[in-house]
Amino acid sequence: MEDKVLLAVAMVALIAVLSKLKSLLETKPKLNLPPGPWTLPLIGSIHHLVSSPLPYRAMRELAHKHGPLMMLWLGEVPTLVVSSPEAAQAITKTHDVTFADRHMNSTVDILTFNGNDIVFGTYGEQWRQLRKLSVLELLSVARVQSFQRIREEEVARFMRNLAASAGAGATVDLSKMISSFINDTFVRESIGSRCKHQDEYLDALHTGIRVAAELSVANLFPSSRLLQSLSTARRKAVAARDEMARILGQIIRETKEAMDWGDKASNESMISVLLRLQKEAGLPIELTDDIVMALMFDLFGAGSDTSSTTLTWCMTEMIRYPATMAKAQAEVREAFKGKTTITEDDLSRANLSYLKLVVKEALRLHCPVPLLIPRKCRETCQIMGYDIPKDTCVLVNVWAICRDSRYWEDADEFKPERFENSSLDYKGTSHEYLPFGSGRRMCPGGNLGVANMELALASLLYHFDWKLPSGQEPKDVDVWEAAGLVGRKNAGLVLHPVSRFAPVNA
């Protein structure tokens, strides 16, 4: 929330706006809106969300009282909260086209170069062409496989760093090391090499994502031009976008020069694919540099954050459940007995069924984006007997759905075995399990995200035993998420790595 001065200005400026809205609404037929908690003038339902620093937790409790379709007012923004598989199916499958737009606030519009991306872009011909391009050219199975050498090199470097710490008897913040590893991997996949400015770019990216997810007055009262002009959130978003554009602009220029000189290595990265397509004639849309930068914003934001978050939660939950850790380690060590390094070819030949269950369960218990990316209702419609007005913001609380005791036995417990003999997958067809969403707006990068995790997770379990610092018990490990769009672990995961099978060159 921004400072009190802006809130005071908001109260004065918006009384007239709300009065006008009230008069307009009185002339329209009364709608049968979904139920919701009582509201206050100006702020709407926001006071109901302060019981937890994590809105999706507070929303789950409210949904227990008001139902799986619940209407909130976040400032002047009507917001539908979806909290059951049946309601999620209605939104993301039955009425998918009606809810195919994204809810755009002013900060997101800035960060995505006026919505020129896939994640937040307006549903239409340009969006369809960009998604098709991403699925076929950037995130295809063949493209993901082409990055195998990069993943293997980065995992090997990660293991060597851990082995050095283990040899010194030191503790490590594994969550930070995982984040660094995933970022390095994704930077190389995206632009072809490590970038000297990658830390500045990622700092600007994370600042932008944080600002976009905040309940700032600019986002709560989008109709007020005064608040938009006074908003510090907008200024932060502009600064973050300009920093990202500066760095990406330099990378684009350097990549174009390398491609012109015939550097084959420059043709292997995602950005080089985009620049090659930009140069070729025949695309149904013009692939401008702004669109390229917006797509890179999507790829970095979705690819790096969600993968590192899920890998951290896998290790966190196995530390909390030692029997699960032992079972996963036994499977990996039996499969790769005698090896000094694990490769992706080794992984493809091995049947690491339990390891895959661990990843599935981590994605259930700790959905990467707990409320998914907000959708918007394109036209007034009926869902489960209720009227949903045009332009309503829609939040699908997959965190609550994936912990619903009606569908999951011992829903708050980490039990990979629950997925044995189960047909549930990441494809968004089973609406009680939607870690990557569903429908037209489902995340297209799930294959790359899982690929960036699996080899690292197997290597962490194969090469090292893991112990908590002295005096800590598994039950003491913090499992609260940090506030924000992505459900990151709030506290660092500090552990003692103990070398079991030393990685090569350690």
Swiss-Prot record:
The chain crosses the membrane at residues 5-25. It is found in: Membrane. Keywords: Heme, Iron, Membrane, Metal-binding, Monooxygenase, Oxidoreductase, Plant defense, Transmembrane, Transmembrane helix. It is a single-pass membrane protein. InterPro entries: Cyt_P450, Cyt_P450_CS, Cyt_P450_E_grp-I, Cyt_P450_sf. The keyword tRNA-binding does not apply. It is an enzyme of class 1 (oxidoreductase). Gene3D superfamilies: Cytochrome P450. GO terms for biological process: defense response; diterpene phytoalexin biosynthetic process. Its EC number is 1.14.14.159. One of its GO terms (cellular component) is membrane. It catalyses: dolabradiene + reduced [NADPH--hemoprotein reductase] + O2 = 15,16-epoxydolabrene + oxidized [NADPH--hemoprotein reductase] + H2O + H(+); 15,16-epoxydolabrene + reduced [NADPH--hemoprotein reductase] + O2 = 3beta-hydroxy-15,16-epoxydolabrene + oxidized [NADPH--hemoprotein reductase] + H2O + H(+). The keyword Transcription regulation does not apply. One of its GO terms (molecular function) is iron ion binding. It holds the Pfam family p450. Its main location: membrane. Its cofactor is heme. Heme binds at residue 443. Involved in the production of antifungal dolabralexin phytoalexins in response to biotic and abiotic stresses. PANTHER family: 4-HYDROXYPHENYLACETALDEHYDE OXIME MONOOXYGENASE (PTHR47955:SF11), CYTOCHROME P450 FAMILY 71 PROTEIN (PTHR47955). Belongs to the cytochrome P450 family. This is Dolabradiene monooxygenase. It comes from Zea mays (Maize).
